[in-house]
Amino acid sequence: MTERRDNVSHAPDAIEGPNDGAHAEDTSPGFFSLENLGVAQVQVVGGTLNGFSIGFVAVYILLYEVATNCSLFKTTEACKAVGSYGCEWKDTEVCSWKKECDSDSDGVNPCESLIGYSSLYSGIFASAMIVGSMVGSIIAGKCITMFGLKKSFIIVGVMSVVASALNHISVATNEFWVLCAGRVLMGIGLGVVCVICPMYVNENAHPKLSKVDGVLFQVFITFGIMLAAMLGLILDKTVNYDNDPDMAGRFHGFCAVSSVLSVAMFLVGMFLRESTATFSQDDDGKADGGMDPNEYGWGQMLWPLFMGAVTAGTLQLTGINAVMNYAPKITENLGMD
């Protein structure tokens, strides 16, 4: 009987463990709780802005090709509306180019060289943000150490707003190099974003939700790319070639999405709570509390750095950026409308 009592007396202990764990689990915040959304918002805004900026190039190039293809516009009103893109209404009652077409062109259309950007300009435009992102990712670590995550978000927000303003200026003046300057500046900001968004979540998300919050950045990058593509489809298919096509308005409307996301990034930085982890050094460069940025030497970080570089390099070698930037041209050359 004593043996039985001992067995029974141990039963509550066996039951208490799981109950305690369940109780602890119940006290953790839900995914849609304000506590978790306050952390996850950086992934949502940062990922969407990053994705939209990736999808920006293909749509902008497509719209520019439409705006500079003067032969598409069938009336005087429509032709005059795209006069800033090199079109004019001729005495022959057709909309054509102000510049003389290349009579030595090997293409079917001798004015083909006047439609859209040249191969060189398209390459510069497509690579501008990539160059900026490379610079931004390099300086991100120093930026975080100097300013912390919260101020880094604010700085990125300001840079993104300025870059978006340059996009609108480029549309108004039809200045290619202003557009490229905006893309480089946006790239620098996004290079930092790709570092600070996952880092903020890693440091502040509840352990139960850290993995779910962690994947949101990539999810919303994909959403941003899809958003840009859907807007491009709508803007392209709704052009009225018989009346005022309002191409400048379409460019401004498309760029306005980037502007809204940039302002959202700035506001996120302004109202974001400070990270629970901080980097702190005294005047001699030694840690005086918080996390020590010199805790690990280069030798210890070499393998993780190598793995990160190989993973990122493999992703780029798939050609995803080339496909995203030149998707309309690729499908056009394949005979797909």
From Swiss-Prot:
It is a multi-pass membrane protein. One of its GO terms (molecular function) is hexose transmembrane transporter activity. Keywords: Glycoprotein, Membrane, Sugar transport, Transmembrane, Transmembrane helix, Transport. It is found in: Membrane. Residues 65-119, 174-175, 236-250, 322-337 are extracellular. It comes from the Eukaryota. Coiled coil: none annotated. Residues 1-22 are annotated as: Disordered. Residues 1-43, 141-152, 197-214, 272-300 are cytoplasmic. Gene3D superfamilies: MFS general substrate transporter like domains. GO terms for cellular component: membrane. The chain crosses the membrane at residues 44-64, 120-140, 153-173, 176-196, 215-235, 251-271, 301-321. InterPro entries: GLUT, MFS_dom, MFS_sugar_transport-like, MFS_trans_sf, Sugar/inositol_transpt. Glycans are attached at residue 69. Belongs to the major facilitator superfamily. Sugar transporter (TC 2.A.1.1) family. Facilitative glucose transporter. This is Glucose transporter 2C. The gene is THT2C.
